């Protein structure tokens, strides 16, 4: 009964009666396959297909119906909150649009700001996933020398470059930073001997813990790692790093 209830509405009453009287088997109507809408055609031009980007891949249309996918070991694209597509990573420095005293990286996972001129020793701050940390350098000390306070100096940098220099924060000592997508390499460049102990101040809401290897791990309330500061060391630029004679001075205090 259920089958007839489903079939009957699709068969005219007169036609059904004639089929029964003639003794001819009723023929079921053929079911047509469902129509699948065609995918919209894309007018592809040879080159990268930006919509196909991922954090570490690029897809190119070769112009002959074939595609090339390039996979990178490190992230080359960034998609920040509110963005629909991935954008190119750029660790180049540019003037900030939010603060006239800031120089910032163009587009990096680790959002980095440097002061064009230091303020009370503060020279940089970093942001990642809603967390932040600011860096200040306060004083320098050494054996048989009197400790000295850091001098607030103006930064030297070039737009579209990833290097920034605060010269002579102490006598004959420069502070240099080189920016990357997920990190920053910081160097204290000593042009003379004497000072080799440096005091920094870090401001953050994160929990800071010194590890066995001397590095500092900064974690959130869920004990997840947010930032990691490797232990500072000093390298003699007059010694070939590949010779095995590089001296690493581990008296730097943070």
From Swiss-Prot:
GO terms for cellular component: extracellular region. It is found in: Secreted, Cell wall. It comes from the Bacteria. This is Wall-associated protein. Residues 25-46 are annotated as: Disordered. Keywords: Cell wall, Repeat, Secreted, Signal.
């Amino acid at each position: 009964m259920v089958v007839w209830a489903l079939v009957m509405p699709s068969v005219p009453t007169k036609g059904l009666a004639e089929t029964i009287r003639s003794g001819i088997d009723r023929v079921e109507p053929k079911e047509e396959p469902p129509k699948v809408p065609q995918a919209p055609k894309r007018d592809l031009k040879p080159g990268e297909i930006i919509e196909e980007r991922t954090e570490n891949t690029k897809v190119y249309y070769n112009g002959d119906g074939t595609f090339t996918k390039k996979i990178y070991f490190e992230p080359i694209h960034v998609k920040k909150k509110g963005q629909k597509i991935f954008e190119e990573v750029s660790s180049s420095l540019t003037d900030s649009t939010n603060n006239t005293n800031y120089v910032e990286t163009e587009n990096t996972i680790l959002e980095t700001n440097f002061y064009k001129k230091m303020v009370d020793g503060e020279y940089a701050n970093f942001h990642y996933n809603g967390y932040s940390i600011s860096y200040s350098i306060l004083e320098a000390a050494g054996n048989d020398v009197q400790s000295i306070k850091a001098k607030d100096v103006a930064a030297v940098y070039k737009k579209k470059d990833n290097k920034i220099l605060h010269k002579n924060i102490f006598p004959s000592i420069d502070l240099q930073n080189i920016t990357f997508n997920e990190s920053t390499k910081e160097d204290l460049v000593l042009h003379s001997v004497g000072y080799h102990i440096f005091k920094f101040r870090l401001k953050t809401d994160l929990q800071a813990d010194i590890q066995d290897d001397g590095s500092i791990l900064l974690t959130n309330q869920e004990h997840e790692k947010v930032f990691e500061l490797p232990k500072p060391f000093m390298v003699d630029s007059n010694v070939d790093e590949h010779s095995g004679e590089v001296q690493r001075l581990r008296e730097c205090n943070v």
